[in-house]
């Protein structure tokens, strides 16, 4: 098959992020590479590409985490490999804010704040808007500006944000970021659009 796999990259891999991204993937009829979780990431880019290829459905969600390491850590090295692989089509990136202002930063096309509002400003770890236009700090985002990525959506700490994104509430901030990427990429117009999402819940 020459069809590229449709992938959403997520720059967070802790236990909260993993549970939330697995939930989001199920809601949109996709698959999450659960083995990509880790703080920091433990799977190489080559290993992740093989796991993506074996996933039964698109979109495929993959997590990357440098656990605060400066420069290009294992998560970013794997992200770069996956994002530039010829068998992968990146639909978008969910860029997750870090807890320190000394961390690396990336440009973002838009952010979604803790109240679910779309903004051109960056957000912090708890999802509050910051003052930087189209810019956000994070610890696994150093490589994003060097890559040719179609869409980068910034959000606060996945599954947290002062319980605003709690999975018991349906993780509304993460879900909005996912839906924004799917809509902007034109993915919903394809054969596995949102209308089919319920089919994968028990599979």
From Swiss-Prot:
One GO term (biological process): sporulation resulting in formation of a cellular spore
Organism superkingdom: Bacteria
Record's keyword terms, sorted: Sporulation
Protein name: Stage V sporulation protein AE
Species this chain originates from: Bacillus subtilis (strain 168)
């Amino acid at each position: 098959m020459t069809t590229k796999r449709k992938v959403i990259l997520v720059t967070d891999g802790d236990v909260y992020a993993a549970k939330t991204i697995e939930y989001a993937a199920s809601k949109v009829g996709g698959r999450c590479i659960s083995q990509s979780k880790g703080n920091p990431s433990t799977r190489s880019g080559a290993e992740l590409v093989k796991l993506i290829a074996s996933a039964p459905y698109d979109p495929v969600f993959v997590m990357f985490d440098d656990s605060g390491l400066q420069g290009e850590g294992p998560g970013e090295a794997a992200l770069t490999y996956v994002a530039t692989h010829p068998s992968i089509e990146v639909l978008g990136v969910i860029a997750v804010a870090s807890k320190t202002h000394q961390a690396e930063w990336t440009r973002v096309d838009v952010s979604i704040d803790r109240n679910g509002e779309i903004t051109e400003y960056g957000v912090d770890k708890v999802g509050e808007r910051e003052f930087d236009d189209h810019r956000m700090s994070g610890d696994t985002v150093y490589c994003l500006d060097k890559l040719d990525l179609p869409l980068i959506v910034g959000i606060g700490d996945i599954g947290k944000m002062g319980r605003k994104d709690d999975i018991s509430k349906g993780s509304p901030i993460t879900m909005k970021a996912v839906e924004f990427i799917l809509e902007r990429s034109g993915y919903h117009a394809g054969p596995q659009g949102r209308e089919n999402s319920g089919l994968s819940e028990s599979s």
